[in-house]
Amino acid sequence: MSGVEEISTLDEFRERRSDFEISEDERRRSKIGNLKKKAINASTKFTHSLKKRGKRKIDYRVPAVSIEDVRDEKEESVVLEFRRKLLERDLLPPRHDEYHTLLRFLKARDLNIEKTTQLWEEMLRWRKEYGTDTILEDFDFEELEEVLQYYPQGYHGVDKEGRPVYIERLGKAHPSKLMRITTIDRYLKYHVQEFERALQEKFPACSIAAKRRICSTTTILDVQGLGIKNFTPTAANLVAAMSKIDNSYYPETLHRMYIVNAGTGFKKMLWPAAQKFLDAKTIAKIHVLEPKSLFKLHEVIDSSQLPEFLGGSCSCFGDGGGCLRSNKGPWNDPEIMKLIYHGESSLFRQSTRKLTDPHYSSSYISIHPSKAIQAETSAAESISCSDVPSSPTGRLCSASSHVNSAYEEARASDVNGYYSCDDKFAIPDKATNRKGQERQSQYQMRELNATTIGLKCETSSPGAPIIRWLHDLRVMIDKIKCENLAKRLLSLMLKLAAVFRYTPLELLRSQTTVSPSSLTEDDSRCSLISPPPREPTMKDRILPCLERIQKLEKSYEDIRNKPVAIPVEKERMLMDSLDRIKSVEFDLDKTKRLLHATVMKQMEITEMLQNIRDSQLHRRRRLFC
């Protein structure tokens, strides 16, 4: 029995030992599994950090805004033709490449492309000289509060169609006191600044609120109390300069104008004088209303959007200055302004209808990323390729950036398409879809060829081992299995360390470049190290100066050879001006004679009245005597 007991105790010992070994194996496996999970998490974090570094994702999860956009087919074709011509002449900056901006200028010249091009060139020249593009940031109108005391004005609400309402109380304007506070030049800069603010803030905000395209304003001029005292030479110069800016540089931004509280004197004397500063199109948009006709404003503007002095029901405080200081409107809504300016991108869904066919409608999406996101994305992309200038990945990135820039230039060269905020996402047919797939495959093949060319070039360069190891690392990481991830990653890192150890420092510092022309001519060719720049000689320095002197001499000869005589058109203008002066002198002489005759007649009447009074007094004296 003792032998049996020994066998049983031996079996128990083996079972305990096997249980202990099994538990140890499980612990090891669990530890290995935890290590694998940690390695996978670390690798995913590392790759995600690299992806985030290379590009930033833009979150478009904002509420889509549907904006109706009604277009005329004829106007649209003229706009496309005008845009193509501007692109050919390099006269279309990106900030002005917008359908409704081009249409406004075309309407100002009756859809005449030649005349509109001249107006457009003048506008671009003026914006560059005046600094209009940065006037919102550069110009500070410090005297605004004092100016508004002597020239009450401001935006207040919207009309029934969603356009912003601009109000001026001309009857309470004092030009002489205004010029003591500011100057004409500073006030004109403030005028331009308000126009730019309307284009960049008020019109987009009203478009989002009204869900239709808003590109113009409704203006109300209150002329109650306006008289000759308000029409000084300074006021005339200011009005002329403002009308020049409005008509030439911001055309077709006025939808309609109402001159309210106009008396008989204004209609007969002041209104005819004011028409001399306006063009025919602007005059056709102006409606003159008497004090009894203020109710006509309610046909186009709701009473809640009108101040009390114009027959409305609004009596907002407006920072102590009444309705004109309140700046009431959709542009004060933080949610709307967040869509326009803030960090979130805005997604506008535009629906287009043609006037010729009311049943036709097409919708398209226009994405407007914010300026902050654009700057952040561009900065991240620039960092991703330029962090390590001596690394081969940086070289490959530079080669691919050359291809991307070439692709962008090829896409931008298509002037027949309209690539602005109004690009249509229409449903293509089979033929166009096939063409699009072919183009996409061509672009993909170009990028693939560029990558292979970059690899070929790098293999012939001195730092080829580094590129090969990094390429192998990328391929192996894609194909590797989870259970061997930590082991293989460690071995690859050791191999990389050995390569860096035995590779000379000069080979690491050498850089290669891939020229874009080699991508299109021959895939087997690649440009290696660029030759050092040649030092400029004395001849190279003198040659540009000689060319400039020759140009100056040529221009001087052209100016000298010009005829001294006055051109025929200017001579006609001078003759017409002389004729007008003569006619005015004749009218003045005639008026002078009439005034003289009137004075003489008045003196005769006065003398006759005096004689009659004397005779009556003489008769009374006789009666009393």
UniProtKB/Swiss-Prot annotation:
Top-level taxonomic group: Eukaryota
Keywords, in A-Z order: Cell membrane, Golgi apparatus, Membrane, Protein transport, Transport
* UniProt gene name: SFH13
Its annotated compartments are:
Golgi apparatus membrane; Cell membrane
Report the PANTHER family cross-referenced here: CRAL-TRIO DOMAIN-CONTAINING PROTEIN YKL091C-RELATED, PHOSPHATIDYLINOSITOL_PHOSPHATIDYLCHOLINE TRANSFER PROTEIN SFH13
Q: How does it sit in the membrane?
A: Peripheral membrane protein
GO terms (BP aspect): protein transport
Primary role: Required for transport of secretory proteins from the Golgi complex. Catalyzes the transfer of phosphatidylinositol and phosphatidylcholine between membranes in vitro.
Question: What is the name of the protein in this document?
Answer: Phosphatidylinositol/phosphatidylcholine transfer protein SFH13
Report the sequence similarity comment from the record: Belongs to the SFH family.
Task: Please tell me one Gene Ontology term that the record gives under cellular component.
Answer: plasma membrane
Q: One of this protein's Pfam families, by short name?
A: CRAL_TRIO
Chain ranges of the CRAL-TRIO domain:
143-318
**Lineage of producing organism:** Eukaryota, Viridiplantae, Streptophyta, Embryophyta, Tracheophyta
Q: Which InterPro entries match?
A: CRAL-TRIO_dom, CRAL-TRIO_dom_sf, CRAL/TRIO_N_dom, CRAL/TRIO_N_dom_sf, PI/PC_transfer
Q: Which Gene3D superfamilies match?
A: CRAL-TRIO lipid binding domain, N-terminal domain of phosphatidylinositol transfer protein sec14p
